[in-house]
């Protein structure tokens, strides 16, 4: 009996020490020690932060596909966030981060559970130029029985520069993401997660990334459903049609050869990372820049293990995709990204009006997809359609926001939903978020507290606790729980459900009307339908050489 009591005491002592020191798990490359935390509603959960999933992409590995990680000795301290990837930060207007940045963050309420939990992965946005997985905390998600994972991936030219051949194939950032998805598949069991029930989510560039993973052979079998919040690979800002031209422009800025791609690649690998990222900043066409020219692209036939070999719209129409369910979404004032930033400086809107014809090609992202002879007339058509032909200013600001939102996000999110439903024959859902809560991403960009509407990413910030941001208003808390219920029901059953709402109808394959659910409040949720979601008919009429009008020959005529 005494021996039994001693044995029990030692077990309890061991558990107590484990609790005080933080949770530990063993993954393929070694032992991790995280930390215990408390969720929004007081639930205990474990966080494992700054967990490496690939070798640092430095030196000879810069621009290359991610390389397998070697085992580490001892115990890896996973109790704190590590560096974001090297980037230009639009908010801080400076360069931050490190090239040694390929980390995941794993949050789990039951690291030692017998019953495996569904997994939700979130890919951060930031125009493929800035951001980090650690900016999105698991504190709200941990009120549900699921495992939540965020990740870093290479950004800007370090993640997406391409020489158009095997020297620098491009898409390194997307290959990082795919490598991280495989890491989750192979290791998430050790955190109590179910590798056979993975929901891939992301917002903005992260939402477009989700779409890209549906199209990439590298990511096949790594997830089972997805949510593309406010992002589509059909949007022009998410895909480069002139990657070599842009790569050479950057090489010239940092003093590298542009005549031979081998020499160019070698030179770029030996330039300091900060110099390369700063070179990108020098390429900006306007002083208010929230998008980068270094984005995903189709890779050359000579590239081994390509992420993408077809133009996204072509791949989708060919049905060359992972056939699993999909949710897409928009907010009611998507165009506040980037238009909210125009409010931070009183000189911006007058400058935009004075140079409308020149700047419209950049803010609406058609510099590389519209022939020169059409640019003046298209700029005027946009102003006529959305601003009634009036000057850009505070009086027409709302129209400018809608124009930017429809062009950069909504029209192509709707197009993604309809094509996915038709080609995959899998359940496809759309929602539109129009509830203004206490915090808005637009306030961060505008640097004021004005109510401009429901910004791009406001729904995601509420769910995933960006930065972090929080609210105490009862209706906001109810709205957050409603969105969390949506994600949780979808992650567990494959069917999204919203409390206090009608049945969420799927997108009907082959139909011109797009069915979507409008989320205007926790108790104001309704089904709606539109044959012109995001005013796609107007945007499709302007002659952009994109999507259904894309051809390689057209690229050379611009």
Where are the model-predicted features located?
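Non-catalytic accessory segments of hydrolases
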Residues: 2-3, 12-174, 195, 299, ...
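Serine-hydrolase-like catalytic core of hydrolytic proteins
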Residues: 3-12, 90-265, 270, 288, ...
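A structural signal for well-ordered alpha-helical segments within the folded catalytic domains
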Residues: 46, 99-102, 175-178, 182, ...
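Extracellular structured ligand-interaction cores
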Residues: 48, 99-103, 118, 323-324, ...
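Surface-exposed helix-capping loop/turn segments at secondary-structure junctions
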Residues: 108-117, 188-197, 257-261, 394, ...
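Short, solvent-exposed turn/loop segments enriched in Gly/Ser/Thr/Pro and often Arg
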Residues: 201-205, 431-439, 502-511
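Sec/Tat-exported extracytoplasmic proteins
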Residues: 217, 230, 254, 272, ...
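Substrate-gating cap/lid region and adjacent catalytic-acid/histidine neighborhood
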Residues: 267, 273-477, 486, 493, ...
């Amino acid at each position: 009996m005494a021996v039994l009591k001693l044995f029990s005491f030692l077990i309890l002592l061991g558990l107590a020490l484990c609790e005080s020191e933080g949770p530990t798990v063993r993954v393929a490359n070694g032992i991790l020690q995280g930390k215990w935390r408390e969720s929004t509603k007081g639930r205990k959960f474990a966080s494992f932060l700054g967990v490496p999933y690939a070798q640092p992409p430095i030196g000879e590995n810069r621009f290359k596909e991610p390389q397998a990680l070697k085992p580490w000795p001892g115990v890896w301290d996973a109790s704190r966030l590590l560096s974001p990837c090297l980037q230009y930060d639009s908010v801080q207007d400076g360069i931050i981060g490190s090239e040694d940045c390929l980390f995941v963050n794993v949050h789990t309420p039951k690291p030692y559970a017998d019953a495996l939990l569904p997994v939700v992965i979130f890919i951060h946005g930031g125009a493929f130029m800035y951001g980090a997985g650690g900016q999105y905390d698991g504190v709200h998600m941990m009120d549900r029985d699921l495992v939540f994972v965020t990740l870093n991936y290479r950004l800007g030219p370090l993640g997406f520069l391409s020489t158009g051949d095997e020297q620098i194939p491009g898409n390194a950032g997307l290959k990082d993401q795919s490598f991280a998805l495989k890491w989750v598949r192979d290791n998430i069991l050790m955190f109590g997660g179910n590798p056979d029930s993975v929901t891939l989510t992301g917002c903005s560039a992260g939402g477009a990334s989700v779409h890209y993973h549906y199209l990439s052979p590298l990511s096949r079998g790594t997830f089972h459903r997805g949510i593309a919040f406010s992002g589509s690979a059909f949007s022009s800002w998410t895909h480069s049609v002139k990657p070599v031209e842009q790569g050479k422009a950057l090489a010239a800025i940092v003093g590298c050869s542009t005549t031979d791609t081998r020499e160019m690649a070698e030179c770029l690998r030996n330039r300091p990372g900060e110099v390369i990222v700063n070179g990108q900043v020098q390429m900006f066409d306007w002083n208010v820049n929230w998008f980068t020219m270094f984005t995903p692209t189709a890779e050359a036939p000579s590239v081994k293990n390509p992420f993408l070999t077809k133009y996204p719209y072509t791949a989708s129409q060919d049905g060359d995709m992972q056939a699993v369910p999909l949710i897409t979404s928009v907010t009611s004032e998507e165009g506040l990204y980037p238009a909210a930033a125009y409010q931070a400086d009183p000189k911006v809107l007058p400058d935009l009006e004075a140079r409308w014809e020149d700047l419209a090609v950049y803010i609406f992202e058609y510099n590389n997809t519209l022939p020169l002879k059409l640019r003046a007339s298209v700029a005027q058509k946009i102003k006529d359609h959305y601003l009634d032909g009036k000057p850009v200013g505070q009086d027409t600001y709302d129209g400018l926001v809608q124009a930017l939102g429809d062009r950069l996000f909504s029209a192509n999110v709707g197009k993604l939903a309809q094509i996915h439903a038709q080609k995959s024959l899998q359940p496809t859902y759309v929602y539109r978020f129009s509830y203004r809560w206490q915090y808005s991403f637009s306030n961060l960009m505008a640097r004021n507290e004005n109510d401009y509407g429901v910004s791009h990413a406001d729904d995601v910030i509420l769910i995933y606790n960006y930065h972090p941001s929080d609210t105490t208003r009862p209706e906001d808390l109810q709205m957050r729980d409603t969105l969390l219920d949506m994600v949780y029901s979808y992650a567990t059953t494959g069917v999204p459900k919203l409390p206090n709402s009608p049945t969420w109808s799927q997108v009907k394959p082959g139909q011109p009307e797009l069915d979507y659910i409008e989320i205007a409040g926790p108790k104001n949720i309704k089904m709606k339908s539109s044959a012109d979601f995001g005013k796609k008919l107007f945007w499709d009429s302007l002659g952009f050489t994109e999507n259904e009008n894309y051809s390689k020959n057209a690229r050379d005529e611009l």
